């Protein structure tokens, strides 16, 4: 994910699930988002899920085995994709929800059988999807 071969091009679909937050830094994750679009044919679609800091202390977790992206980070990445590759990206849905599953935050050692939100250090995290398509060829 840090060194995508340049000959991997022309694909209709690129997908990752909870992966690019493990590249070691916010910057590395955002670079992956930009680089992965080169793999797509014009009109190809990408879907990536990642960790999203949805609460807790100010700031975020960066330069670690898992990083937590903020809304500002995700919007920056989306802006670069739109500008560089004319990507059409679905709007982010960052609604927290009000149901019991939405409001429950699991804490280490994560005993709950299922959860939507985790306490990671000083922050609350959940998963968010980035969905888009590549525009013109570059």
Language model segments and positions:
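A short, conserved alpha-helix within the catalytic core of class I
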Residues: 23-36
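Short conserved loop adjoining the S-adenosyl-L-methionine
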Residues: 2-8
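Conserved beta-strand signature within the Rossmann-like core of class I S-adenosyl-L-methionine
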Residues: 43-51
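Local beta-strand N-terminus motif with an aromatic residue
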Residues: 10-12
């Amino acid at each position: 994910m840090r060194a995508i071969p340049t000959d991997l091009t022309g694909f209709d679909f690129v997908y990752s699930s909870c992966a690019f937050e493990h590249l070691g830094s916010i910057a590395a994750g955002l670079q992956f988002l930009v680089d992965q679009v080169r793999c797509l044919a014009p009109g190809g679609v990408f879907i990536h899920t990642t960790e999203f800091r949805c609460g807790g202390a100010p700031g975020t977790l960066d330069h670690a085995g898992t990083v937590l992206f903020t809304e500002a980070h995700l919007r920056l990445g989306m802006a670069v994709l739109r500008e560089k590759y004319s990507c059409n990206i679905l709007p982010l849905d960052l609604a927290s929800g009000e149901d019991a599953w939405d409001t429950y935050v699991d804490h280490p050692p994560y005993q709950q059988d299922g959860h939507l939100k985790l306490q990671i250090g000083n922050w609350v995290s959940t998963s968010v999807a980035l969905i888009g398509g590549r525009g013109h060829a570059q």
